[in-house]
């Protein structure tokens, strides 16, 4: 019997809520001054438009207030999200928890991320495409941003039904094969996730996929996982070209590991320069809480002629987005100390 989307998602989020935080109780030599310095830098970079990613700093500075699940239950009472065309060839498919993006090309459709499981792939991805007047049989590639079940879980369903190529980094394919389990959950893989897909197409840093004139360039951005992918591609808004980056992994749900948090921060510094060279002016996430996709889609519904597309945030906002991620990672590192066991 199929589990309802609401019930399944509630259990899934509960698990993530337990795993995504990094408790300061692990601290050995926490540095409150450094925490404050990095949180201040992240807050300055966030301004008023990047409050979603700024929430990552809460792992370093927990404060009283509604719990994650309180906020999630309030969110659940809202109507489900409908699929939506957000650029000339870019479509939102997803829930209020996890997102898939569809890129339409002259040669078929590319899906970026496959959500939690087969039910969601069928309901949100396949069903969402049909609602938008697109044919899911035209899916040619499914890009899996990283080896966590909330992004690969529906991939095998799509593979079996439509036979697209499944794309992930070599590093994260190896992680799945070595453990035969979701790296996030170790020996306790969440049964709400679909089975890990079978290895198909591996990409490395700097590789490109071409489909009928549309090019996707992949960068390996170690941090969230060691093989997380950022996918960079050109989209158009009413014919005007823009450069988008789908940043494949955001939270620090790998545990209290100072070296890993430093790696995460180093990655954001490196890719600020790379995305500056790419002239990226759109950032996309696979969770709506990080790219504010819900508010942006609402703005598009009321968009008047001549108004800008809310998803086109500009190169400065892309740079600030990465600054927030990196500074919150360093704040979290300072909050847990350098002598944390298991680093």
What are these regions (language model features)?
Residues 2-13:
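Bacterial N-terminal signal peptides that target proteins for export
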Residues 11-21:
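Bacterial N-terminal signal peptides
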Residues 28-108, 118, 342-343:
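Zn-dependent metallo-beta-lactamase
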Residues 31-34, 38, 44, 119-123, ...:
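Active-site HxH/HxHxD metal-binding segment of metal-dependent hydrolases
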Residues 70, 79-80, 85-87, 109, 116-118, 123, 198-200, 208-210, ...:
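Metallo-beta-lactamase
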Residues 76-132, 230-252:
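Conserved beta-strand hairpin/beta-sheet module of binuclear metal-dependent hydrolase folds
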Residues 291-343:
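Binuclear metal-ion centers of metallo-dependent hydrolases, dominated by the metallo-beta-lactamase
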